[in-house]
From Swiss-Prot:
Stable up to 37 degrees Celsius but is rapidly inactivated over 40 degrees Celsius. Slightly activated by Ba(2+), Ca(2+), Mn(2+), Mg(2+), and Co(2+), while Hg(2+) and Cu(2+) cause marked inhibition of the activity. Ni(2+), Zn(2+) and Cd(2+) have no effect on the catalytic activity. Is also slightly inhibited by lactate, pyruvate, succinate, acetate and formate. InterPro entries: 23BDH (IPR014007), NAD(P)-bd_dom_sf (IPR036291), Sc_DH/Rdtase_CS (IPR020904), SDR_fam (IPR002347). It comes from Corynebacterium glutamicum. This is L-2,3-butanediol dehydrogenase.
Length: 258
């Protein structure tokens, strides 16, 4: 019987790459995303089914705790179990520090931090209910290791995810659950297109130039693609990582060394 994973933000980008890789590893996948993303999620589901695994779409607003609880219940019921949660959903904000508003902070913390907290709580309770030793895998970032200018709000949320990952790992270890995080660098996805465009508005550089400059420091000589990140998540979701918990692992091609 296949194990079951739920991937938040699974309709596109890194979430799609993770879903496809976990399906190749033999997982059935609940693709969780905002209801209006169901059409995009259908493309992810096609990739999962092409790997001969089951897939369902679960409508989820990750900032709503009750919705998160019910989404995990739905995933477990439809797919017949629940073994792994990938807290992948997240947003970026690109603003000078002095222009960040209270509303900006509320929005980015709701999506990037509160949702991770809600997911950890809901997944752990479901693991306990089903009697499984589960795995929770959170989305961090190179910005969880080093703060970046113009990304101050985003950086603080990712530092929060790092601390939460470490704390949750210690609390849930007696139950046999592991909690880890992946920390991508420069990934060629829609989020980085947004970051590049917003930075261009601020510093006047041509579109693509900021992405190029950030990528120039990567030791392996190229920005990453979702498949690079998915490979690490694959390890963290597998039995090969059973003795790994509380870790925030860089997958940045050699940008930061920590």
């Amino acid at each position: 019987m296949s194990k079951v994973a739920m991937v938040t933000g699974g309709a596109q980008g890194i979430g799609r790459g993770i879903s496809e890789k976990l399906a190749a590893d033999g997982f059935d996948i609940a693709v969780a995303d905002l209801p209006q993303q169901e059409e995009q999620a259908a493309e992810t589901i096609k990739l999962i089914e092409a790997a001969d695994q089951k897939a369902v779409f679960v409508g989820l607003d990750v900032t709503d705790k009750a919705n998160f609880d019910s989404a995990i219940d739905e995933a477990a019921e439809k797919l017949g179990g629940f073994d792994v949660l990938v807290n992948n959903a997240g947003i970026a904000q690109i603003k000078p520090l002095l222009e960040v508003t209270e509303e900006d902070l509320k929005q980015i913390y709701s999506v990037n931090v509160f949702s991770v907290f809600f997911g950890i709580q809901a997944a752990s309770r479901k693991f306990d209910e089903l009697g499984v030793k589960g795995k929770i895998i959170n989305a961090a970032s190179i910005a969880a290791i080093q703060g970046f200018p113009i990304l101050s709000a985003y950086s603080t949320t990712k530092f929060a995810v790092r601390g939460l990952t470490q704390a949750a790992a210690q609390e849930l270890a007696p139950k046999g659950h592991t909690v880890n995080a992946y920390a991508p660098g420069i990934v060629g996805t829609g989020m980085w297109e947004q970051i590049d465009a917003e930075l261009s508005k601020i510093n006047g550089k041509p579109i693509g130039e900021n992405f190029k400059e950030y990528s120039s420091s990567i030791a392996l000589g190229r920005p990453s693609v979702p498949e690079d990140v998915a490979g690490l998540v694959s390890f963290l979701a597998s039995e090969n990582s059973n003795y790994v918990t509380g870790q925030v692992m860089l997958v940045d091609g050699g940008m930061l060394y920590n």
